[in-house]
């Protein structure tokens, strides 16, 4: 708006000069005016375009936050029977966290339709609001790699040796669990194996490990927990290899970073398409 005002003032002044000059010089002045006016418009237009592109790029960087694998971490049933690995203390800085207490933020889907990072500050109020019911799915909620690839399979039971239980191979796995106030929308779910979501069905594996830890702590203490869940992809694959979760309570009693593997014993996953095969 300021640039437009400047442009208008310049035009008025130049017109005044033009009409106050003698006729012979007016023709020359007119062409000078025309050229200068056109150049001025171009200059301001170019400046405005540069500013627009800068803001657009800044917003893109802020809102689309899919992460690629930096260092391959291999899963095996002996070392990681519950499908998660501790990475030490969290990376969370309270002063730099993008949301406030009781708020949630989900990245926009990237150009491949992949889910990005989710942030939330889990409060006792949000936990109580979510207790005893599940939020209905809203709109198109199938994450990248999910559609057409899911079917029921048999998994080894963690409760009875030699026994199996039947379940869907893939879940629409929440980045921020609905029990923690997370929304049932596409930007908050990834295509995750049953094991990535709940481990071996024993409430201490997969995403449930850190989710239950945070849930129980908030219920017990009433303290807020800062929570960040980040799906990690390799190159242009559309199913994440794993999810990295950072959780830190406001009193520092919970301060943890975990890697949750997106795989399943006895199966091979094509992360480029979401198809899977029994070994």
Segments and roles (model prediction):
Residues 99-279:
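Domain-level detector of nuclease and nuclease-like folds
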Residues 1-28:
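Sec-dependent N-terminal signal peptides of Gram-positive bacterial secreted proteins and lipoproteins
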Residues 16-19, 60, 88, 259-260:
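Compositionally biased amphipathic helical and low-complexity segments enriched in hydrophobic
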Residues 24-96:
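N-terminal, intrinsically disordered, polar/charged segments of Gram-positive cell-envelope systems
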Residues 5, 20, 31-34, 38, ...:
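Compositionally biased, low-structure terminal segments
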């Amino acid at each position: 708006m300021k640039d437009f005002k400047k442009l208008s003032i310049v035009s008025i002044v130049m017109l005044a000069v033009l009409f106050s000059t003698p006729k012979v010089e007016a023709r020359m002045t007119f062409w000078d005016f025309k050229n200068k006016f056109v150049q001025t418009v171009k200059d301001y237009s170019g400046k405005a375009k540069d500013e627009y592109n800068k803001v657009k790029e800044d917003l893109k960087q802020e809102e689309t936050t899919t992460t690629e694998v930096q260092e391959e971490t291999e899963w095996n049933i002996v070392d990681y029977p519950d499908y998660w690995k501790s990475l030490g203390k969290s990376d969370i800085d309270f002063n730099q966290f993008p949301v406030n207490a009781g708020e949630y933020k989900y990245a926009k889907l990237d150009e491949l339709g992949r889910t990005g990072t989710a942030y939330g500050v889990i409060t006792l109020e949000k936990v109580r609001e979510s207790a005893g019911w599940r939020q209905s799915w809203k709109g198109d909620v199938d994450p990248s790699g999910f559609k057409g690839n899911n079917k029921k399979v048999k998994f080894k039971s963690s409760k009875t040796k030699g026994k199996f239980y039947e379940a869907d191979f893939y879940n629409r796995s929440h980045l921020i669990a609905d029990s923690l106030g997370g929304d049932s929308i596409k930007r908050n779910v990834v295509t995750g194996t049953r094991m990535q979501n709940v481990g071996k069905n024993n409430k201490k594996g997969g995403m449930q490990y850190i989710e239950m830890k945070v849930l129980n702590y908030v219920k017990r203490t009433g303290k807020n927990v800062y929570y960040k869940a980040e799906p990690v992809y390799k190159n242009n694959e559309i199913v994440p290899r794993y999810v990295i979760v950072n959780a830190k309570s406001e009193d520092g009693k919970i301060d943890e970073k975990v890697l949750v593997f997106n795989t399943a014993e006895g199966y091979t996953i094509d992360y480029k398409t979401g198809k899977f095969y029994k070994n």
